[in-house]
Amino acid sequence: MGRFIFVSFGLLVVFLSLSGAKGNNCPQDWLPMNGLCYKIFDELKAWKDAEMFCRKYKPGCHLASFHLYGESPEIAEYISDYHKGQSEVWIGLWDKKKDFSWEWTDRSCTDYLSWDKNQPDHYQNKEFCVELVSDTGYRLWNDQVCESKNAFLCQCKF
């Protein structure tokens, strides 16, 4: 009987340690999702400066890219919980060629888009970088002048 209890307790410890792991190596205050970690930074930066900040934070980091509709609600909730300001939030999508051919800075496939109504519009032929719109609960996107200053969302693999 004592051996049974000892083995059962040992299996319980192993199970609890494995169930808590989930392959999540994200630091505190980062959102783990689909094998990546996401963090909102409230410091206001131009789009290129935000991308450079993410890259310098850790090799392989970039402004965030999204590939599934299902990611939007979780990201939006995380930003609403942790973003201290009211600004829009830069993500890693941009129109490098200025011809409505949108690309992610991490060079991943542009297979999902979530534009706000009447967007993108390249307003006055000046908007080539993409932000999450605060008025939509950070669920929809707008193209914006890249030199505008926004908070930003980095994604990293730890």
From Swiss-Prot:
Keyword line: Calcium, Disulfide bond, Hemagglutinin, Lectin, Metal-binding, Secreted, Signal
Motif Galactose-binding positions after renumbering to this chain: 119-121
Cross-referenced PROSITE patterns: C_TYPE_LECTIN_1, C_TYPE_LECTIN_2
Tissue spec: Expressed by the venom gland.
Molecular function, one GO term: metal ion binding
Cysteine pairings via disulfide bonds: C26-C37, C54-C154, C61-C156, C129-C146
Localization terms from the record: Secreted
Signal peptide region: 1-23
SUPFAM superfamilies: C-type lectin-like
GO terms for cellular component: extracellular region
Keyword rRNA processing: no
Domain C-type lectin residues, every copy: 33-155
Subunit structure: Homodimer; disulfide-linked.
Described function: Lectin with a hemagglutinating activity that is inhibited by galactose, lactose and EDTA. Is calcium-dependent. Shows effects on the renal function of isolated perfused rat kidneys by increasing both perfusion pressure (PP) and renal vascular resistance (RVR). In addition, the urinary flow and glomerular filtration rate (GFR) decreases significantly.
Family note: Belongs to the true venom lectin family.
Official protein name in the record: C-type lectin BiL
